[in-house]
Amino acid sequence: MIDTIKVNNKTIPWLYVERGFEIPSFNYVLKTENVDGRSGSIYKGRRLESYSFDIPLVVRNDYLSHNGFKTHDDVLNELVKFFNYEEQVKLQFKSKDWYWNAYFEGPIKLHKEFAIPVKFTIKVVLTDPYKYSVTGYKNTAISDQVSVVNSGTADTPLIVEARAIKPSSYFMITKNDEDYFMVGDDEVTKEVKDYMPPVYHSEFRDFKGWTKMITEDIPSNDLGGKVGGDFVISNLGEGYKATNFSDAKGWVGAGAKRGLPKAMTDFQITYKCIVEQKGKGAGRTAQHIYDSDGKLLASIGYENKYHDRKIGHIVVTLYNQKGDPKKIYDYQNKPIMYNLDRIVVYMRLRRVGNKFSIKTWKFDHIKDPDRRKPIDMDEKEWIDGGKFYQRPASIIAIYSAKYNGYKWMEMNGLGSFNTEILPKPKGARDVIIQKGDLVKIDMQAKSVVINEEPMLSEKSFGSNYFNVDSGYSELIIQPENVFDTTVKWQDRYL
């Protein structure tokens, strides 16, 4: 049977695997030790190692093949596009229902004078020596128990998604009374109280409660500008997109404002946005925080100020009673972000007393649409020694803008999460998971996020990420009657 290979589910119609190729598997390597005066050696164990091998490939190159007769350079250029990845890719034989996570290594050698057919080899490097089923599986917990059937020949990692139907101080999942993973604190001797009650949490799916900003421009050098534009619902109904920009010079955009249900002395405010940076352009989007007198207290936002470069940065600025700005945070994207087409950016500002804490993180929205693997994370603290920035937070505004006369890098707000922080007695258990929060645990990536915020710092010291063995496993969820839990996995083979 003629077979071909798929790379990230893509194929080349004139490329085939040469007959007779032997698929390598079960790459166990034994460790032994020689002992003086003793025949043979002592068995010390075995391990599954990474390995590499060549796949022999054939190019069909005649007038009846796809696209007809092809030159040396035609073929080479297509092959380079097909195999040129810096990261792992899914490598699958079209006839098989499993794939490897593979890297490719050169060179590609093609005869200068093309023959019919054209033969060459590509080197495959497997740092992950397992095969994974193309089909994924999932099961939902019933009465806080969920079964997993791994039909493969090797243990396999899990993805756990748990939606809270009640507030909780922890989430725990255990396997057959052997292994467990926990985030939070379950110590029963500690008092449990919600010391961080939500004041206003909202995904941007409608404009209920928001007022359009028509004349009140935002006096922030990094994140402000002129208002007057409109917001429309965008990003599949999940974001505010600015439209109808004014003809004024400089930064022009759309703004919307609302009062909070209550003023917050100590608070945690998170703003998330999506940045469309496939094309170059200048843009900014931010959440602005005001005191009860309507004066700016703080601004948190994302900006790309270069119309011909993709060098975004996150800025946090505070304002005293007179309106004088104090920039306390300016974090430029790491180079790994420059080549991403669409990113989701989170920025969080926390104030407790005179200490301000900033935490920022991002997701590659194309490769990680479920937002399980945060990237480019950063944290910083800043002390308000003179206590110039202690006014309560009472009003918030969302603003997105472009620089008139230049191409716009579209940036849309996705959500605003405003939480009050109450005094917490020493040793008390905090409710780190609110009703409606989604806990995501990726056992293979070794990541845990709650409502898309990295929460590895909350992982219980004694717990660990675990795999499920080949065959049947029973998982238990705790606390009881608090979470709707789904477990996802793939069969894995040696």
What are these regions (language model features)?
Residues 296-306, 345-351, 394-399, 439-442:
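Broad, structure-driven detector of short, well-ordered beta-strand segments within folded domains
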Residues 315-346:
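Short, aromatic/His-centered strand-loop micro-motif at the edge of beta-sheets
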